[in-house]
Curated annotation (Swiss-Prot):
Transmembrane is among the record's keywords: yes
Subcellular location: Cell membrane; Golgi apparatus membrane; Golgi apparatus, trans-Golgi network membrane; Recycling endosome membrane
Its membrane topology: Multi-pass membrane protein
InterPro entries from the UniProt entry: SCAMP
GO terms for cellular component: Golgi membrane; plasma membrane; recycling endosome membrane; synaptic vesicle membrane; trans-Golgi network membrane
Subunit structure: Interacts (via C-terminal part) with SYT1 and SYT2; interaction with synaptotagmins making a link with the SNARE molecules. Interacts with SLC9A7.
Keywords annotated in UniProt: Cell membrane, Cytoplasmic vesicle, Endosome, Exocytosis, Golgi apparatus, Membrane, Protein transport, Synapse, Transmembrane, Transmembrane helix, Transport
PANTHER family assigned to the protein according to its UniProt record, in alphabetical order: SECRETORY CARRIER-ASSOCIATED MEMBRANE PROTEIN 5, SECRETORY CARRIER-ASSOCIATED MEMBRANE PROTEIN SCAMP
UniProt protein name: Secretory carrier-associated membrane protein 5
Record topological domains on the Cytoplasmic side: 1-39, 89-102, 170-235
Job description of the protein: Required for the calcium-dependent exocytosis of signal sequence-containing cytokines such as CCL5. Probably acts in cooperation with the SNARE machinery.
Amino acid sequence: MAEKVNNFPPLPKFIPLKPCFYQDFEADIPPQHLSMTKRLYYLWMLNSVTLAVNLVGCLAWLIGGGGATNFGLAFLWLILFTPCSYVCWFRPIYKAFKTDSSFSFMAFFFTFMAQLVISIIQAVGIPGWGVCGWIATISFFGTSIGSAVVMLIPTVMFTVMAVFSFIALSMVHKFYRGSGGSLSKAQEEWTTGAWKNPHVQQAAQNAAMGAAQGAMNQPQTQYSATPNYTYSNEM
């Protein structure tokens, strides 16, 4: 088997850094989990874009007469939360769907609930926290309407992010409970060390993908539309 080369994030060649992770949805994720995994990846991308737009909103806030603290914090949140959210909650759910690991599911639930709380706080928008939320935006309309309109864009995006995060958390939790997952199972994986054993992870991945392929390729019994009667020659 060819060695997997890290391919994420895809960095330009002029940057003297190499990708840190290997990511291939079609190769790693079983078909029945592919759609949900990609949706969570798109949610991470939305979060990253929202943080970038928030930086623009805080710049408009600064130009309109707001303090420089918000712009500085917005820049900090962008460079901090973008990689941290990928490592802390997307990689665990990617690994959870890849290897059917209860420990990875629990790691996702713990960190993603924190992400949900952060998204709600960002949508609220407490002044001085480096986010263009509802409180900060509405209160700034009396100072500069133009800046407030620009600030309204990341405010709406933070709100959408919070709603989508709640929906995503509910969907993953419903799937996990429906598949028989539990906290005790995650604790068992932690105790036995199965969550970090590459051989166990590979076996779980192969079993999950094999079951999915078997379900799709299972032949269906064909029945003839014409009845076939067998008569005995004995009277």
